[in-house]
Swiss-Prot record:
GO terms for molecular function: NADH:ubiquinone reductase (non-electrogenic) activity; quinone binding. It holds the Pfam family Oxidored_q2. This is NADH-quinone oxidoreductase subunit K 2. One of its GO terms (cellular component) is plasma membrane. Keywords: Cell inner membrane, Cell membrane, Membrane, NAD, Quinone, Translocase, Transmembrane, Transmembrane helix, Transport, Ubiquinone. The keyword Cell membrane applies. NDH-1 is composed of 14 different subunits. Subunits NuoA, H, J, K, L, M, N constitute the membrane sector of the complex. The gene is nuoK2. It comes from the Bacteria. Gene3D superfamilies: 1.10.287.3510. It is an enzyme of class 7 (translocase). It is found in: Cell inner membrane. Signal peptide: none annotated.
Length: 114
């Protein structure tokens, strides 16, 4: 039995909406990264469904590209999260001012040029 294309798009849209909610409504960096991953998987489902609908291989090629991007995003994102957690002790994004220019300049002024 073949699943209708509309059902595949409905599933992909529901997953994408869940991912957006998870990424926007949560106050935890790990949940934000998880939401982005859910959105990427929803896009993959839509591409696979479209490829099956029109019997083309471009959908599978896009999914391989999405998987590579997702793996890279997870590895870099988790490395940044681990670094930020070690520095602040919190997963709350509001606690992170790591890229604030004023702090870097004050630190430079205290130490002086090297």
């Amino acid at each position: 039995m073949i699943v209708p294309f509309g059902h595949v798009l409905l599933l992909a849209g529901a997953l994408f909406g869940l991912g957006v909610f998870c990424a926007v409504a949560r106050r935890n960096l790990i949940m934000i990264v998880l939401g982005v991953e859910i959105m990427l998987n929803a896009a993959s489902i839509a591409f696979i469904g479209a490829a099956a609908r029109w019997q083309s291989m471009e959908g599978q090629a896009f999914v391989l590209f999405i998987l590579a991007v997702a793996a890279t995003e997870v590895s870099i994102g988790l490395a940044i999260i681990v670094y930020a957690f070690r520095r602040t002790g919190s997963f709350d994004p509001a606690a992170y001012n790591l890229m604030k220019a004023g702090d870097a300049m004050q630190s430079f002024e205290r130490r002086g040029p090297q």
